Amino acid sequence: MRDSTPLIHPTAVIDPSATLADDVRVGAFSLIGADVQIGAGTEVGPHCSIHGPTRIGRNNRFIGHAAIGGEPQDKKYAGERTELVIGDGNVIREFVTINRGTGGGGGVTVVGNDNWMLAYTHVAHDCHVGNHCVFSNNTTLAGHVTVGDYVIISGFAGAHQFCRIGAHAFLGMGALTNGDVPPFTMVGSDSLGRPRGINSEGLKRRGFDAERITAIKRAYRTLYVAGLPLADAKLQLAEQAKSSEDVRGMLEFIEAAERPLLR
């Protein structure tokens, strides 16, 4: 039986300059502004607003009341052209806000593919979010935060501006981090954001075998348990990286740090 629901609800407002694929659905009272592109298979629920310049890929779902592509919340923003780019297969839940970039921060906010952003998540200007991440309710990313692939952020957790969160990391409920979180690391459920071991369960679910997880745990102990100065820990990690691609990735992440490392 063919679905008789209209693709564009009669109460929706679509700017003439917006470009929507033929099968995009837009719900009641939603607004699609100027210079917005939305790819095939995407659904925009009721009461959403999407402002441009924004590029949205295929098969995304905006459940309702999401505010996407709004101006950056930065007093230095002076109306320069900046944009938001969202990939494919993302689920954006109720009251999520994702802002465009700033001229001083690269000009673009990026969200990758297959992410879940639950209610009241905020992704600020110039953030770069990878693929396959889960942001639980009230996750807050300040400006310029970079999040790697397969990161899980629990409810009411957040990251300070310019922080990086490495791939496969896990932030516990209410965790706040003002330093870079290395790949694979768990951050405790407290306001101080202390490291609490390796996200072993998540790695197992993603197909990491025992040998890889053992190497990652050894690297974590070198960095956080052995009591070494960071310079000495990096020397040991460099040796371990010779036999582990995962440790090599951790070391490269640490070497690229511009903010203090979560310690």
Swiss-Prot record:
It is found in: Cytoplasm. One of its GO terms (cellular component) is membrane. Gene3D superfamilies: Hexapeptide repeat proteins, Udp N-acetylglucosamine O-acyltransferase, C-terminal domain. It holds the Pfam family Hexapep. GO terms for molecular function: acyl-[acyl-carrier-protein]-UDP-N-acetylglucosamine O-acyltransferase activity. GO terms for biological process: lipid A biosynthetic process. The keyword Glycoprotein does not apply. Keywords: Acyltransferase, Cytoplasm, Lipid A biosynthesis, Lipid biosynthesis, Lipid metabolism, Repeat, Transferase. It catalyses: a (3R)-hydroxyacyl-[ACP] + UDP-N-acetyl-alpha-D-glucosamine = a UDP-3-O-[(3R)-3-hydroxyacyl]-N-acetyl-alpha-D-glucosamine + holo-[ACP]. Pathway: Glycolipid biosynthesis; lipid IV(A) biosynthesis; lipid IV(A) from (3R)-3-hydroxytetradecanoyl-[acyl-carrier-protein] and UDP-N-acetyl-alpha-D-glucosamine: step 1/6. Its EC number is 2.3.1.129. InterPro entries: Acetyltransf_C (IPR029098), Acetyltransf_C_sf (IPR037157), Hexapep (IPR001451), Lipid_A_LpxA (IPR010137), Trimer_LpxA-like_sf (IPR011004). NCBIfam families: lipid_A_lpxA, PRK05289.1. Belongs to the transferase hexapeptide repeat family. LpxA subfamily. Involved in the biosynthesis of lipid A, a phosphorylated glycolipid that anchors the lipopolysaccharide to the outer membrane of the cell. PANTHER family: ACYL-[ACYL-CARRIER-PROTEIN]--UDP-N-ACETYLGLUCOSAMINE O-ACYLTRANSFERASE, ACYL-[ACYL-CARRIER-PROTEIN]--UDP-N-ACETYLGLUCOSAMINE O-ACYLTRANSFERASE, MITOCHONDRIAL-RELATED. Homotrimer. This is Acyl-[acyl-carrier-protein]--UDP-N-acetylglucosamine O-acyltransferase. The lineage of its organism: Bacteria, Pseudomonadati, Pseudomonadota, Gammaproteobacteria, Lysobacterales. The gene is lpxA.
